[in-house]
Amino acid sequence: MSSPAQPAVPAPLANLKIQHTKIFINNEWHDSVSSKKFPVLNPATEEVICHVEEGDKADVDKAVKAARQAFQIGSPWRTMDASERGRLLNKLADLMERDRLLLATMESMNAGKVFAHAYLLDVEISIKALQYFAGWADKIHGQTIPSDGNIFTYTRREPIGVCGQIIPWNGPLIIFTWKLGPALSCGNTVVVKPAEQTPLTALHMASLIKEAGFPPGVVNIVPGYGPTAGGAISSHMDIDKVSFTGSTEVGKLIKEAAGKSNLKRVTLELGGKSPCIVFADADLDSAVEFAHQGVFFHQGQICVAASRLFVEESIYDEFVRRSVERAKKYILGNPLNSGINQGPQIDKEQHNKILGLIESGKKEGAKLECGGGRWGNKGFFVQPTVFSNVTDEMRIAKEEIFGPVQQIMKFKSMDDVIKRANNTTYGLAAGVFTKDLDKAITVSSALQAGMVWVNCYLAVPVQCPFGGFKMSGNGRELGEHGLYEYTELKTVAMQISQKNS
């Protein structure tokens, strides 16, 4: 069976004008309390796209008050039929489809995503996430429980309340919908802080949320910096839950702030150093391509990046040769331009961090097969880089690089590679490539990771739970489990005169 044809990709919008740069509270646009603004850059050109209102604690306080008011008993949102919440989410998905070209252009310009990927993948995945959680809205059920004695007992899954949602810069639109969808499906209200590098699609989504008909205060969006706006959300005494996607370092700060404030519920999707294991019996062409995409997609700026590639000894040299050949095919440049398949890193800080880790690989004795430096004179570009002869103690084998850098290591036995793969503080994802079913089941069961792919990589269906073991986070996004992260489970027990079966 042939796979369905991909839709044609139109040209990006020319001369895109940014309409929404203010803080969104109570379905209205606000200047920041401080009157401060911050610049938003195009990482391919280093030029300022626009200036956005800089929210801080005072603005977060305003947003939380609006969200709390919208969550009051008897409010339009609390009394709304669950099916109507689902209809509103589907309406929002329809508006995203209408504005697909605008959203994709904005995501490519602001986040450095290759335009075709933004159009075909980012916007599509975001729409599907909203549609999936829209379907759940009137299917969130409690249970009746046959308890002992003349007691009638049942459970309710209730919305938690006001939820803070802190969005990363590497998937601004996708993660926005992954968090917004389940929160609203369950009946919560939200205060969203997009990453300071990439606030534009979130602010456009605010206009669509109002257009879709969500009541005022249900969704509030406060752009700003992590230590100020993000810190205010994490430590706020009237926010009931915080969900964060980003680095493990910042995740620890958020969990600490949540504990020191009101012990708010916390969901964290954090860093990774994901192993990808290729056995000698694997389909070599397929394994090379999946492993390549697993670390080079979106310039390596993905939390599940296959950044520790273990290849069985007997096929190691050939695998390295093919991987280098594949990496050399990239055409770098402005991701809005046709024919480009690698864009820039998000900002100067990330760009310099990646180049520093590449230098550490050279100094520590890894063999640089290709790339290894900056590309071009303008924009935050890094050459596609492949290292061979990498050993486990090197920094490039231990630290999250978040860039287009592939580390290829050699292994001899299954037992050996399982131990090495698990020898990390992270546990987000892993990949296994083999035609042997016994190997596939044994290794996937042994790996300490929240998502294990077998003979594929980067497949993250919205219907399935996604999240990490160990220091890669707490809780899950997506799927039924991701939905329940936005509910409190209440037991109601009432005395009755006589119980009957």
UniProtKB/Swiss-Prot annotation:
PROSITE patterns, per the entry: ALDEHYDE_DEHYDR_CYS, ALDEHYDE_DEHYDR_GLU
GO molecular-function terms, A-Z: aldehyde dehydrogenase (NAD+) activity
EC number: 1.2.1.3
EC main group: oxidoreductase
Gene Ontology CC annotation, any one: cytoplasm
Keyword Phosphoprotein: yes
Modified residues (N-acetylserine): 2
Matches recorded under InterPro entries: Ald_DH/histidinol_DH, Ald_DH_C, Ald_DH_CS_CYS, Ald_DH_CS_GLU, Ald_DH_N, Aldehyde_DH_dom
Keywords: Acetylation, Cytoplasm, NAD, Oxidoreductase, Phosphoprotein
Site (Transition state stabilizer) location in chain: 170
Record flagged with keyword Oxidoreductase: yes
Function: Can oxidize benzaldehyde, propionaldehyde and acetaldehyde. No detectable activity with retinal.
PANTHER family: ALDEHYDE DEHYDROGENASE-RELATED (PTHR11699)
Protein name: Aldehyde dehydrogenase, cytosolic 1
Organism per entry: Mus musculus
Upper lineage: Eukaryota, Metazoa, Chordata, Craniata, Vertebrata
Gene that this sequence comes from: Aldh1a7
